[in-house]
Amino acid sequence: MRIQNIFFAVLNPVMRTLLKSRFHRLASRDITILSYRGRKTNRWYETPLSYVYRGQNILLLSSYNTRWWQNFTDEPYPVELLIKRKTLRGMATLHSGQSEFLSSNVAFFLKQLPRDASIYSVKMDSAGDPTENTMKDIGDRVILVVVELDAQNNN
């Protein structure tokens, strides 16, 4: 097991508790709890993740060595996001492999949250942009999940 996996195994329960508490403001500006039903188990799962808004969509990133994103491989999949203690519903779509769509959205995400760049082995330049060299094969290292929020969330 990688050190990073151990770190997140310890941190995730703490973050779930914090994000559901009245002290959520310490982290909820850019960390959400993604909730979804497992395709095979039909159990509810929750995983804390960094998030970024892009228009009316929410962007989530993951590395290939995690498993949660494998539930979204076939088609848009219903999910819930807890953002600032408010539950938002939407449909999650997985994007993987090399594509301009994935690269541009990963670059947008990391420009908003540069602290996450090291997780995905991306270096940032002095202007705060991901370096071209480290973005070259980003689709081989990073999974992008785009959550299209339901219209009812705006009510």
Features from the language model and the residues they span:
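Short secondary-structure boundary/capping segments within folded domains
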Residues: 23-26, 40-43, 137
